[in-house]
UniProtKB/Swiss-Prot annotation:
InterPro entries: Ribosomal_eL18, Ribosomal_eL18/eL18-A/B/_CS, Ribosomal_uL15/eL18, Ribosomal_uL15/eL18_sf
Transmembrane residue ranges: none
Pfam short name (any one): Ribosomal_L18
UniProt source species: Candida albicans (strain SC5314 / ATCC MYA-2876) (Yeast)
Keywords associated with the record: Cytoplasm, Ribonucleoprotein, Ribosomal protein
Protein name stated in the entry: Large ribosomal subunit protein eL18
Assembly and interaction partners: Component of the large ribosomal subunit. Mature ribosomes consist of a small (40S) and a large (60S) subunit. The 40S subunit contains about 32 different proteins and 1 molecule of RNA (18S). The 60S subunit contains 45 different proteins and 3 molecules of RNA (25S, 5.8S and 5S).
GO cellular component: cytosolic large ribosomal subunit
């Protein structure tokens, strides 16, 4: 007798197993961290490897002001900051502490600021030589939901989400449901 196939057969995993990018430098980092993730028992390397697989949208840039805030945490001043993404400058920040920062890439302004304050800007492969198990490190991630597009996601009543509109003016999207004087306001 045949067997009922009640569950779906070839269920595709929603997780990436490699980066989508063809960047050879990224592929070298993946090769390095997949080796470290396999051969060491440290979860740090697994986290870095998974982060290297992410799309650019899910690897938002981290500003130096966010890093300086992270360094103010208790016991974080001597740690190496790890960013799987870009480190960007923030000219609103007046002083920046001396720190060692490992990242995929740095903008010119951010690198200048780090080096000017006596810090170090290193790459992730240099970090692997210094801390193969991620000892004395602190991973910092950027804000994923700060993109303009996220303002429109999950549209519905009382969500306070922005409608997708072609024109932004006094007469557009401002009638019933948007003003007390026009029936009601959500």
């Amino acid at each position: 007798m045949g067997r009922d196939h009640t569950s779906k057969q070839h269920v595709r995993s929603g997780h990436r197993t490699a980066p989508k990018s063809d960047n050879v430098y990224l592929q070298l980092l993946v090769k390095l961290y997949s080796f470290l993730a396999r051969r060491t028992d440290a979860p740090f390397n697994k986290v870095i490897l998974k982060s290297l697989f992410l799309s650019k949208i899910n690897r938002p840039p981290v500003s130096v002001s966010r890093i300086s805030r992270a360094l103010k945490q208790k016991g974080a001043a001597e740690k190496t900051i790890v960013v799987v993404g870009t480190v960007t400058d923030d000219n609103r920040l007046l002083e920046f502490p001396k720190a060692t920062i490992a990242a995929l890439r740095f903008t010119a302004g951010a690198k200048d600021r780090i080096l000017k304050n006596g810090g170090e800007a290193i790459t992730l492969d240099q970090l692997a030589l210094r801390a193969p198990k991620g000892q004395n490190t602190l991973i910092v991630r950027g804000p994923r939901n700060s993109r303009e597009a996220v303002r429109h996601f999950g549209f519905g009543p009382h969500k306070g989400k922005a409608p997708r509109i072609l024109s932004k003016g006094r007469k557009f999207e401002r009638a019933r449901g948007r003003r007390r004087s026009r029936g009601f306001k959500v």
